[in-house]
């Protein structure tokens, strides 16, 4: 399990945590992220995107805690997982702990099978099923690259994505 505990957010702090992951070949990945709003006017965004395939198991767990005295705090959690086959599993577990009023807190969690209509559309354009699945997977995982500028790191990310798809 990979755990990321963000520091307590002080007044006016803006924090983001973004993750993209691929669980495959009977691999099990668990990501736990937490953030604590400790004073007023703080902002946090957690975004998690992943794919489970080939008997892979992927779990995203996020906890956002807005403590008493943190008015005007804003926290949001987003998690999306595509499950490519019946042997694989995905779980998204957003947790919001709200101890004050006059705050904004929201979450969205989507775990679902590969959209057959998307697959059909690509195949109707002459793309093989394997290539169509690869294109969909790349579209899901590649956005993480926007957070990196180092060419070597980007090559490593591309290689990891290509090798797992």
Named regions from a protein language model:
Residues 140-150:
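Short arginine-rich
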Residues 121-126, 131-142:
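Extended amphipathic alpha-helical segments enriched in small hydrophobics
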Residues 1-120, 124-127, 148, 152-165:
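Conserved beta-strand/loop scaffold segments within soluble protein domains that form the structured core
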